[in-house]
Amino acid sequence: MNPRRKKRLGLILALFVGISATVGLMLYALNQNMDLFYTPTELVNGKPDGTKPEVGQRLRIGGMVVAGSVVRDSNSLEVSFKVADVGPQVTVIYDGILPDLFREGQGIVAQGVLVDATTIKAHEVLAKHDEEYMPPEVAEAMKKTHEPLQYTEQQKQGTGQ
């Protein structure tokens, strides 16, 4: 093989290795940043296709904060609360300042890591804007298995239970 062909072959191989490494790193980064969305029922019972998250997996969970479940640590910013749709409840532990719209009975989406089968250590908690708004993922997941809630005018105004 003459020197010109060797040089060309080396250049092609280097280009192939570089492109392969770039694609591999991009796929790895995308996989690390992917958070799957679950409802509390799907987290406990599994999704319809049978998949269940593993302990240590990053995920997002959406549902309603269960009334009477919010427990605040008096020595830190840590808060634990339960989230449910119409099925099982899942405990969310969050160490930080909660959004102003966070309250019991309110819809939330928490992003974090699954600590055990029914506990999530969240690093972000988002509250929905009003009683009518629901994050698209939560609405879609709840629409599949649940009937929509019918609010009275008092409940919409925030004066009734």
Swiss-Prot record:
Q: Keywords of this protein's UniProt record, alphabetized?
A: Cell inner membrane, Cell membrane, Cytochrome c-type biogenesis, Heme, Iron, Membrane, Metal-binding, Signal-anchor, Transmembrane, Transmembrane helix
Against SUPFAM superfamilies, the record matches this protein to: Heme chaperone CcmE
Q: Where is the composition biased (Polar residues)?
A: 151-161
Q: Name one GO molecular function term.
A: metal ion binding
Gene3D superfamilies to which the protein is assigned, alphabetical: Nucleic acid-binding proteins
Annotated InterPro entries: CcmE, CcmE-like_sf, NA-bd_OB-fold
Endpoints of the signal sequence: none
Q: Which GO terms describe its biological process?
A: cytochrome complex assembly
Domain of life per record:
Bacteria
Give the UniProt subcellular location, in the record's own words.
Cell inner membrane
Q: Which cysteines are joined by disulfide bonds?
A: none
Topological relation to the membrane, as annotated: Single-pass type II membrane protein
Identify the residue ranges that face the Cytoplasmic compartment according to the record: 1-8
Q: What does the entry list under GO cellular component? A: plasma membrane
- Give the transmembrane region(s): 9-29
Q: Where does heme bind?
A: H129, Y133
In this entry, the parts of the chain located on the Periplasmic side of the membrane are 30-161
Q: Which NCBIfam families match?
A: PRK13165.1, PRK13254.1-1, PRK13254.1-3, PRK13254.1-5
The record's comment on protein family reads: Belongs to the CcmE/CycJ family.
What does this chain do? Heme chaperone required for the biogenesis of c-type cytochromes. Transiently binds heme delivered by CcmC and transfers the heme to apo-cytochromes in a process facilitated by CcmF and CcmH.
Give the matching PANTHER family.
CYTOCHROME C-TYPE BIOGENESIS PROTEIN CCME HOMOLOG, MITOCHONDRIAL
Q: What's the name of the protein?
A: Cytochrome c-type biogenesis protein CcmE
